[in-house]
């Protein structure tokens, strides 16, 4: 494809317009008085949401140069969501302000790479200051407050706190759709391990980028699978049962993988392949844990089993399996309770006799996975649109709660960023353009609080000025319209969420202000009206050529 190019100020301004377009759509949702955004879908009902990353993912601009800017801003939201699970709107607002102030400096003649050094130094100082302010999360009440703020629903906060109280801080929480109204919490036998799908073509839910298998068979194999004829017999048996299949193996590659991918794309049958967790003897032990949980067998020569001789009786079963790019969660395996209890007892004995701290730690991880179970929160609503929106908020709340447990909490409502900006007042000893870079971050840190106030119908600059006069920890509660001790009032944010928002916003802003040229594909010429001789072949599938 031929390319078109633009350079210098024109390139940077086009990127800024793209960033602004996306940020303007997202920032109206920030704060307790934030509004919703309605997203049209090519299929099904429209989505109504106030989740920043959900809105950002839907935005594509017509102008190719501006679209590059929008995609960079989208990266801020998605990266923050991946790392911390929340704070995507805050990150987007920060990025917009840093880009705005940064481009003003570049236009005035500042050296972009020197500005970048100042921005990076400022982010490091802010991150350290936020960690210093962190308050450890160790009570059920605090966990409930974190979740309630994220979901904007006290009932959700109580439910997530109850779930973590029952399964432990390292336990697994999944969110499922329910046919009934309201919220419901259920504890089930289950396990999660840190390996995701081998190929994204296995995804069944494109929006969540997950593969979800209901009432699935589970094949456990400690070796590599590359030849199709090795797994063909078991695939044929599973297809006849009309059930999905989860394959957990050291590796699935070559002819075997391509066949599974083709069948998944064509929806001949539902299958997901993931790499087995761990290495060496630990991998074998983890596979055996999964076998006990699902009531299956590890297909290994040591027990007289080979892949081409596997029957359905050798496979495990689970009510539900959820696989994303990083994790696999198995819920409600059909393994016998007595077998699971025996395995738990065995692990406890191994922990007692182990004389290696590393081995003991890994055994305790296995015990937590096997004995902790999975908390399933079922969410229902009157309409499909409301159901999707509530499920999004619940998933964000679970992620925010995990982030809070990991690094602690600080005062929310944007006030922590406004107060922590004071560490940059002296310019960190920088001079010239580096000092200008520090000041870019310093000015941008007020933006989240300003927009929380503006969405509540107030003048942002006035609220920011007033909050700066208050002690750290105190700020403006937009839900009640009062200046108060935010931590005591339960208006709190996870430190990890806030740090990620600042770091990711600064990263993209620094990239954008150091950009000097853009290269995009030239738009295709419109086809002639009679349709002869042109335009044929443009409807071929975009994936592999099947």
UniProtKB/Swiss-Prot annotation:
Molecular function GO terms recorded: ATP binding; ATP-dependent protein folding chaperone; isomerase activity; unfolded protein binding
EC class (word): isomerase
UniProt key word Magnesium: no
Subcellular location per the Swiss-Prot or TrEMBL entry: Cytoplasm
Domain of life: Bacteria
Catalytic activity: ATP + H2O + a folded polypeptide = ADP + phosphate + an unfolded polypeptide
Region (Disordered): 523-546
Subcellular location, principal: cytoplasm
Enzyme Commission code: 5.6.1.7
GO biological process, one term: protein refolding
Gene Ontology CC terms: cytoplasm
Keywords: ATP-binding, Chaperone, Cytoplasm, Isomerase, Nucleotide-binding
Annotated ATP binding sites: 29-32, 86-90, 413, 477-479, 493
Classification via HAMAP family: CH60
Oligomeric form and interacting partners: Forms a cylinder of 14 subunits composed of two heptameric rings stacked back-to-back. Interacts with the co-chaperonin GroES.
Biological role: Together with its co-chaperonin GroES, plays an essential role in assisting protein folding. The GroEL-GroES system forms a nano-cage that allows encapsulation of the non-native substrate proteins and provides a physical environment optimized to promote and accelerate protein folding.
Stated family: Belongs to the chaperonin (HSP60) family.
Protein name, entry field: Chaperonin GroEL 1
Organism: Frankia casuarinae (strain DSM 45818 / CECT 9043 / HFP020203 / CcI3)
Gene for this chain: groEL1
